[in-house]
Swiss-Prot record:
It is found in: Membrane. The gene is LRRC53. The chain crosses the membrane at residues 294-314. It comes from Macaca fascicularis. Residues 214-271 form the LRRCT domain. This is Leucine-rich repeat-containing protein 53. It is a single-pass membrane protein.
Length: 510
């Protein structure tokens, strides 16, 4: 908060009834009402408030340079009706801190210096009531373009000197300077101009012009300006400062012929179209805090969008996991395309439980590949020329065919909770044929069916190998060999517990 102090501080060099000169203050000193010149420099002021200057009706010159000022209150300068010179250079004043009312009561203002601040755009409404302004210095800011509205709507008919040097200007509208008919001096040096139209022909009073230290691209679009400049320098009353520095950028083949903007003509200009420049016109200034609010809203919207995307991905992965779990639990029942009992359907009683029936034939042997590769049941017709029973107890990674000695022909083996059980088909559906997943033909013959007695959980029906054991084809790379006879039920149980999970029944055997 700035203070209003009556006494003259020690840091003030001059304190008279007409002049007050101070430096390195953190406040605006309370100068006498008769003060005509108030200079406070190199201090630590953050803003200009209305209470600091409201009583200085006779003030003609106010200098607040190098104070770190960021904000100028809308009515801070309203009482300075006699002010002719306002120096605010080397501060942090931005375009958003100036309003249409900031300079509106300065009817006597002739010199306004806003050099080396943080201005990005210009609005003609700032200077609507400064009819007496003759010098406007805007050099050393961050201005990027001059549109037709930058000085439009102003009453700057008395403006003689305009300094826009050392900015970032890359675009100038064709009628940007038309509201300033009395301009005598224009400085556009040290900007980023590559192309611009002939904006100076309407300025009949122009006698000093600076365009050096830019990034001129000598295309044919620049030819009208080059023609104006050649005619301009023919008069001894006109001065084109640093004309030798109006060099073309070495970017095209035409540069070798032109070399300078002044030498550019229709015969040596580059016919290539220039790069397009996007010009953003500032329709209305953002109020203080609006930019922060806008960034907050955009950040929140982005966070919501990312959250929704994450939920969609998570839901998709969850559905995939459920599908894989369902597939694993019912792998036994999905192994075959049709029920293997011609009259029986797949049974899905509970989650993780399935019955899969396979009719046993004298002519059929069932082999199942159990391993790390995809399980694929193979049904092949028995060969009666099989090898001797000496190899009958060798188990090569796959189940041998199990022929039911005690339960008769037509019995069926099926899986329940990782155990091998026994059943029979209930009726004779007639002889049928079907293809398994391997493309082999399977024959189903009519058999009588005996209903399976109730079994307790974990019970396994004993099975033994018959005396005419048939040699099993080795169809799995995951093999192990044993050379001693063991019961069939033990083989089946051990192999199932090794290769099958507790939740899924992976294979059905005859």
């Amino acid at each position: 908060m700035l203070q209003l102090v009556a006494a003259c501080p020690e840091s003030c060099v001059v304190c008279t009834k007409d002049v007050t000169l101070c430096h390195q203050l953190t406040y605006i000193v309370a100068a006498p009402m008769t003060t005509r010149v108030l200079i406070i420099t190199d201090g630590y002021l953050s803003s200009i408030e209305s209470t600091n200057l409201s009583l200085l009706f006779n003030l003609a010159l106010l200098s607040l340079s190098r104070n770190g000022i960021e904000d100028v209150q809308e009515d801070a300068l309203d009482g300075l009706t006699m002010l002719r010179t306002l120096l605010l250079e080397h501060n942090q004043i931005s375009s958003s801190s100036l309003t249409d009312h900031t300079f509106s009561k300065l009817h006597s203002l002739q010199v306004l210096v806003l050099s080396n601040n943080a201005l990005r755009t210009l609005r003609g409404s700032w200077f609507r009531n400064t009819r007496g302004l003759t010098r406007l210095q805007l050099d050393g800011n961050q201005i990027t373009n001059l549109t037709d509205s930058s000085f439009g709507g102003t009453n700057l008919h008395s403006l003689r000197h305009l300094d826009l040097s050392n900015n970032f200007i890359s675009y100038i509208g064709k009628d940007a300077f038309r509201p300033l008919p009395q301009l005598q001096e224009v400085d556009l040096s040290r900007n980023r101009l590559a192309h611009m139209p002939d904006v100076f022909t309407p300025l009949k009073q122009l006698i000093h012009l600076s365009l050096d230290k830019n990034q001129w691209s000598c295309t044919c679009d620049l030819h009208p300006l080059a023609r104006f400049l050649r005619n301009y320098i023919k008069s001894s009353a006109h001065t084109l400062r640093n004309a030798k520095d109006l060099n073309c950028q070495p970017s095209t083949a035409a540069v070798a012929a032109a070399q300078s903007v002044l030498r550019l003509s229709e015969t040596n200009c580059d016919p290539k179209a220039p790069n397009f420049t996007l010009v953003l016109k500032d329709r209305s200034p953002l109020l203080p805090g609006q930019d922060v609010a806008l960034l907050t809203v955009l950040g929140f919207a982005g966070a919501v969008g990312l959250t929704c995307l994450g939920l969609v991905v998570f839901n998709w992965k969850l559905q995939q996991g459920k599908a894989n779990e369902h597939t694993s639990e019912n792998l036994c029942c999905r192994t075959f395309d049709e029920p293997l009992c011609a009259h029986g359907a797949r049974n899905y009683h509970t989650k993780g439980y399935c019955n899969c029936h396979l009719t046993q034939e004298n002519e059929i042997k069932v082999m199942s590949i159990v391993g790390s590769r995809k399980e694929m049941p193979l049904l092949q017709e028995n060969s009666h020329q099989a090898t001797s029973a000496s190899e009958s107890t060798t188990l090569d990674g796959s189940f041998r065919n199990l022929k039911k000695k005690d339960h008769g022909v037509g019995s069926t083996l099926f899986c329940q909770d990782g155990r091998l059980l026994h059943s029979r088909c209930s009726q004779s559906p007639g002889n049928t044929t079907a293809f398994n997943e391997a493309g082999l033909l399977t024959t189903y013959n009519s058999r009588k069916v005996q209903k399976l007695r109730n079994l307790e959980s974990g019970e396994v029906l004993p099975q033994t190998l018959p005396h005419h054991i048939i040699r099993t084809e080795d169809i799995s790379s995951d093999t192990f060999r044993r050379r001693y006879a063991i019961p069939t039920s033990a083989l089946a149980g051990e192999s199932l517990e090794k290769h099958l999970t507790n939740e899924s029944c992976l294979h059905t055997l005859n």
